Amino acid sequence: MAPPGSRTVLLLALTIIARTQALKPTHYLTKHDVERLKASLDRPFTSLESAFYSIVGLSSLGAQVPDEKKACTFIKSNLDPSNVDSLFYPPQSSQALSGCEISISNETKDLLLAAVSEDSSVTQIYHAVAALSGFGLPLASQEALGALTARLSKEETVLATVQALQTASYLSQQADLRSIVEEIEDLVARLDELGGVYLQFEEGLLETTALFVAATYKLMDHEGTEPSIKEDQVIQLMNTIFSKKNFESLPEAFSVASAAAALSQNRYHVPVVVVPEGSPSDTQEQAFLRLQVTNVLSQPLTQATVKLEHAKSVASRATVLQKTSFTPVGDVFELNFVNVKFSSGYYDFSVKVEGDNRYIANTVELRVKISTEVGITNVDLSTVDKDQSIAPKTTRVTYPAKAKGPFIADSPQNFALFFQLVDVNTGAELTPHQTFVRLHNQKTGQEVVFVAEPDSKNVYRFELDTSERKIEFDSASGTYTLYLIIGDATLKNPIHWNVADVVIRFPEEDAPSTVLSKNLFTAKQEIQHLFRDPEKRPPTVVSNTFTGLILSPLLLLFALWIRIGAKISNFTFGLTIIFHLGHAMLAMYVYWTQLNMFQTLKYLAILGSVTFLAGNRMLAQQAIKRTAH
């Protein structure tokens, strides 16, 4: 039979798997993250570009540069009226500063108008159009749209398309912007999905992804149509953009700030972030749940309404509470369920945020733990005669006291422990996950642990029969201290109770000769590795005799040459000597006396090369001599 609580553990595991499959915001900007992002943007100005990133980025987060007058002076003093890119940054920055007005000459205006051409890059067209709009100068939107569309057909990069979206947001609503708006759907198709949680462009640049989100919602707010992005895709983009918390690059910090502002303040999609205030663990003394409901910038959505759809027990899946509204308390929403009798355990709370049709990811699942205190009742210690000839001797003990006198468990009689566990707050019966009986030998330190299991009436019973349990105890008789251990993740007061002393006696023939304390953590005996002894080499006489036999054919060859009067004058002695000195026989001899196989092969490779070259050269010279004769 499965131990108590195994069914609950199984249901808990299945619920966690099901819940993790739901797409929800996993990354957003906490208040600490927002301050850190502001610090990344608040840097000394080194150029018009850096000033633009700092001023406009901080403005997106609802902040201002420390010295606006100084910032305005810096912008005016660094403006280059002959450079289109330089003219893009000042008007955008000045609009985020109070009392900073910048004007340009007619020549500069003509320069910007000339840049809105098919011959210019998408970046230059974007900068020129944004500059003209920022300076409040008129622009032929339809002509600019034609130049932008023509140029975009030649630049098909993701960044160029994003800049086209940014450009279109400055053009008149009277212009037909459909061709640019359709690019949004194409860009969404080019996004790569990572693990079903993130969406990003193939290049993996966070800056490009963030600028795409900011440009899309700015254009759609300007155009007045909902973007062709699914709500799940918005959440995936959000998870990607806000997954990074530290920024060394000023443009990257600016892009994240722009995306955060767009996702917090647009007409179509506002992701909702629901975070429990503190740990979502509630007790019977504090039966309430507080939630922070914010946008991606951790700004409270105080106008929202928060409702509990249902609260279900993880173990039984029974609905214990449903259709209940949270109460706004300052910047948080509070649910008080003091009048609802929750038994201890885990519950899934389904919470829905309403009040604005722009809200997305507005239904969340929260795992709430209801904790309680466990009480031990009806604790009986009994000595039971095996043949039932003597009535059981029962002693009742009250937690946390220890029973008086030792109890005996031996061959004629067994020892038994009975108890019940209840919820102190509600009086309901409890079956914690961990209920153990621990027996500790007072002399040797040996420990034996058993699991106490409840019966059909939830009465826990532990019985010790020495004849059946002698293996666990190694037949070690002695006085054991009995502890009751009760624990569970939902219990505020785990229990380790010294209940009584039990004298356990095993038959003498079963007792070990020496009772040793079992310590599982002592050092084990060192393992000695035995390697095979090297083979003995043959005696010197044997090796010398074998060497002589090997050399005998060579000596016989020399003797036969002398007898037949071989003419050795035709040999080229230099090469011949080298050829014969390189003979492999020498290597074979050394192999026999000194080397192993691998060393011999290495030397043979060297000798073989020299021998081959010398022999080849020698034979070639012999052939030349024969030809000459």
UniProtKB/Swiss-Prot annotation:
It is a multi-pass membrane protein. The chain crosses the membrane at residues 542-562, 571-591, 595-615. GO terms for cellular component: oligosaccharyltransferase complex. Pathway: Protein modification; protein glycosylation. Coiled coil: none annotated. Keywords: Endoplasmic reticulum, Glycoprotein, Isopeptide bond, Membrane, Signal, Transmembrane, Transmembrane helix, Ubl conjugation. Glycans are attached at N106. GO terms for biological process: protein N-linked glycosylation. It comes from the Eukaryota. The keyword Signal applies. Residues 1-22 form the signal peptide. There is a cross-link at K154 (Glycyl lysine isopeptide (Lys-Gly) (interchain with G-Cter in ubiquitin)). It holds the Pfam family Ribophorin_II. The keyword Transmembrane applies. Residues 563-570, 616-629 are cytoplasmic. It is found in: Endoplasmic reticulum; Endoplasmic reticulum membrane. Residues 23-541, 592-594 are lumenal. Belongs to the SWP1 family. Component of the oligosaccharyltransferase (OST) complex. OST exists in two different complex forms which contain common core subunits RPN1, RPN2, OST48, OST4, DAD1 and TMEM258, either STT3A or STT3B as catalytic subunits, and form-specific accessory subunits. STT3A complex assembly occurs through the formation of 3 subcomplexes. Subcomplex 1 contains RPN1 and TMEM258, subcomplex 2 contains the STT3A-specific subunits STT3A, DC2/OSTC, and KCP2 as well as the core subunit OST4, and subcomplex 3 contains RPN2, DAD1, and OST48. Subunit of the oligosaccharyl transferase (OST) complex that catalyzes the initial transfer of a defined glycan (Glc(3)Man(9)GlcNAc(2) in eukaryotes) from the lipid carrier dolichol-pyrophosphate to an asparagine residue within an Asn-X-Ser/Thr consensus motif in nascent polypeptide chains, the first step in protein N-glycosylation. N-glycosylation occurs cotranslationally and the complex associates with the Sec61 complex at the channel-forming translocon complex that mediates protein translocation across the endoplasmic reticulum (ER). All subunits are required for a maximal enzyme activity. PANTHER family: DOLICHYL-DIPHOSPHOOLIGOSACCHARIDE--PROTEIN GLYCOSYLTRANSFERASE SUBUNIT 2 (PTHR12640:SF0), RIBOPHORIN II (PTHR12640). This is Dolichyl-diphosphooligosaccharide--protein glycosyltransferase subunit 2. It comes from Sus scrofa. The gene is RPN2.
